[in-house]
Amino acid sequence: MNITNTPTSPVAIITGGAGGLGFAIAERLVRKGARVALFDFNEEALQKAQRELGEPTFVAKVDVADRTAVGLAVEAVAEAFGRINILINCAGITGYTNIKSHEVDLEDFNRVMRVNVNGCLNTFQAVVPHMLRQEYGRVLHFASISGKEGNAGMLAYSTSKAAVIGMTKVQGKEYAGTGITVNAIAPAVILTEIHTIMPEAQIKYMTDKIPMKRCGTKDEVAAIVEFIVSPEASFTTGFTFDLSGGRATY
């Protein structure tokens, strides 16, 4: 599968792109000839990512929950590269975990929703006008298996990812005739930096539900993402791809 089938090198914005899944995806797309713009709140990690990926990688310190900052960063990418072909929303936080719903802190719940849900909408609304003018675009939102099935002790995260799946269904239908596809991906546990801060009991709880009895890898995620955002993936929209080792079969 080759994303360079477009007339010119595709330009991809990747939120949460300085580390974890976002960076793994960026590495793969760059190898395939894409130009990438990484949005992240960690400036030090952004600079490191830019050095490793090389020029002409674009980086911007952005809180995706900040609508104004997102808009400015997207316009800077469009000015730098002349187009935006791909949007991959990887930025996300788990919030507090291993807590029952009646004990959930509302401030933390709202913070997770702002980043995980509003963040996807903020970038989508800033990028899609560019895609509409081009009559082409690929949007991929990162959901989670917890958004499909719910993980006990993770109310904020599970709720936010269920919302992302719902958003994807709506957007897929709304833009189906425009040349823009909008899809989501729902991984189970993937070994990334975010899981190093989760309690071991929570990781075991999630891994035990996977029939393959293992975590997924960043390379496995990057491989399927490459296809979803490619020109070849032209007849699938509003869909949530699973990457769950057999945990979800629907």
For each feature predicted by the language model, list its residue ranges.
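Substrate-binding pocket helix/loop in short-chain dehydrogenase/reductase
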Residues: N98-S101, D105-N110, H195, M206
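Alpha-helical segment proximal to the catalytic Tyr-Lys
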Residues: P129, K173-G177, S234
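Residue(s) in the substrate-gating loop at a strand-loop-helix junction
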Residues: S144
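The beta1-alpha1 cofactor-binding region of Rossmann-like NAD(H)/NADP(H)-dependent oxidoreductases
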Residues: E43-E44, V62-A73, L106, D219-E220
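Canonical Rossmann dinucleotide-binding motif of NAD(H)/NADP(H)-dependent dehydrogenases/reductases
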Residues: N2-V36
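Short C-terminal tail/terminal secondary-structure segment
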Residues: N2-T4, N98, E149, E226, ...
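Active-site helix of classical SDR
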Residues: F124, S160, T168
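Catalytic Tyr-X3-Lys loop
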Residues: H102-L121, Y136, L140, V164, ...
